[in-house]
From Swiss-Prot:
One of its GO terms (cellular component) is cytoplasm. Keywords: Amino-acid biosynthesis, ATP-binding, Cytoplasm, Glycosyltransferase, Histidine biosynthesis, Magnesium, Metal-binding, Nucleotide-binding, Transferase. GO terms for biological process: L-histidine biosynthetic process. The lineage of its organism: Bacteria, Pseudomonadati, Pseudomonadota, Gammaproteobacteria, Aeromonadales. It catalyses: 1-(5-phospho-beta-D-ribosyl)-ATP + diphosphate = 5-phospho-alpha-D-ribose 1-diphosphate + ATP. The gene is hisG. It is an enzyme of class 2 (transferase). The keyword Repeat does not apply. This is ATP phosphoribosyltransferase. GO terms for molecular function: ATP binding; ATP phosphoribosyltransferase activity; magnesium ion binding. SUPFAM superfamilies: GlnB-like (SSF54913), Periplasmic binding protein-like II (SSF53850). The keyword Lipid biosynthesis does not apply. Catalyzes the condensation of ATP and 5-phosphoribose 1-diphosphate to form N'-(5'-phosphoribosyl)-ATP (PR-ATP). Has a crucial role in the pathway because the rate of histidine biosynthesis seems to be controlled primarily by regulation of HisG enzymatic activity. Feedback inhibited by histidine. Pfam families: HisG (PF01634), HisG_C (PF08029). It comes from Tolumonas auensis (strain DSM 9187 / NBRC 110442 / TA 4).
Length: 298
């Protein structure tokens, strides 16, 4: 690979892969991501996308093999703790928290067992893919345990007699329920992040990062925002603006044949609920339209 091309590592397959691809494409990257290729070249920018296992991404960034990485915070933190124990470099820069990949790392026990608190795990066998995060949490609680390291299907460990509890990622809890387990304690909350190697980039690469970040921030802002149009009574503008979260300096235009109302356009930065629309209507607003925003640059 050309050392002057920006290198971005992302998950090849898994829960972050598709969302990461869509995010990069929405930022204007023209990428041909074929399943049989581990390196993809962005057609319209000097950028290479490396598609790797998610638990390899933090190390690639910390070792400065790649410039940027998109990775779950759970994997990032676990890798950092592991590398600290091995005396390896752990520095990186976090550029942006992303709005997907949300999950939690939780303790779970068999459904029929009573949960009396973390102290009940003293000396027990706990199956996990995240031994360092688990060890740190339990050490803070003064609890020692016997780790059972598994790389997959952690939830079957209690039924298989391998462990008495598990520590695993949870999204909806359906997998735990299907395996006769119940979630009892969240130990870490995670979402996807964009990270950068802790080094000074070539000027050409830094220019690309400087172009990427406003696009990325604009896309994330657009996802959180709605464009709202309505007819509003002039004497209620302040109250209506106060109802719309994040609304600043709405655009107000006169209506052709109504001197008591105006057309009001505003960008609200949070979800507009039905209850809010009902309150707007109660204040005299009409013809209320709520539209998604594809792109935004502040």
């Amino acid at each position: 690979m050309d050392s002057k091309r920006l290198r971005i590592a992302m998950q090849k397959s898994g829960r972050l892969s598709q969302d990461s691809q869509e995010l990069l494409k929405s930022c204007g990257f023209k990428i041909n991501l074929r399943e049989d290729r581990l390196i993809a070249h962005v057609e319209n920018m000097p950028i290479d996308i490396l598609r790797v296992r998610d638990d390899d991404i933090p190390g690639l960034v910390m070792d400065k093999v790649v410039d940027l990485g998109i990775v779950g915070e759970n994997v990032l933190e676990e890798t950092m703790l592991e590398r600290q124990s091995q005396g390896l470099p752990t520095s990186y820069k976090k550029l942006k928290d992303l709005d997907y990949g949300g999950c939690r790392l939780s303790l779970a026990i068999p459904r029929e067992e009573e949960w009396t608190g973390v102290a009940a795990l003293q000396g027990k066998k706990i199956a996990t893919t995240y031994p360092h995060l688990l060890k740190r949490f339990l050490a803070e609680q003064g609890v020692t345990f016997k780790p059972v390291l598994l790389t997959g299907s952690v939830e079957v460990a209690p039924r298989a007699g391998l462990a008495e509890a598990i520590c695993d990622l949870v999204s909806s809890g359906a997998t735990l329920e299907a395996n006769g387990l119940k979630e009892v304690q969240v130990i870490y909350r995670s979402k996807a992040s964009l990270i950068q190697a802790d080094t000074e980039l070539y000027p050409e690469k830094q220019k690309l990062v400087d172009r990427l970040m406003p696009r990325l921030e604009g896309m994330l802002q657009a996802r959180e925002s709605k464009y709202i149009m309505m007819h509003a009574p002039k004497d209620k503008l302040a109250e209506i603006t106060a109802l719309l979260p994040g609304a600043e300096n709405p655009t107000v235009m006169p209506l052709a044949s109504d001197s008591t109302h105006v057309a009001m356009h505003v960008v609200a930065t949070e979800t507009l609920f039905w209850e809010t629309m009902e309150k707007l209507k109660a204040l005299g607003a009409s013809s209320i339209l709520v539209l998604p925003i594809e792109k935004m640059m502040m």
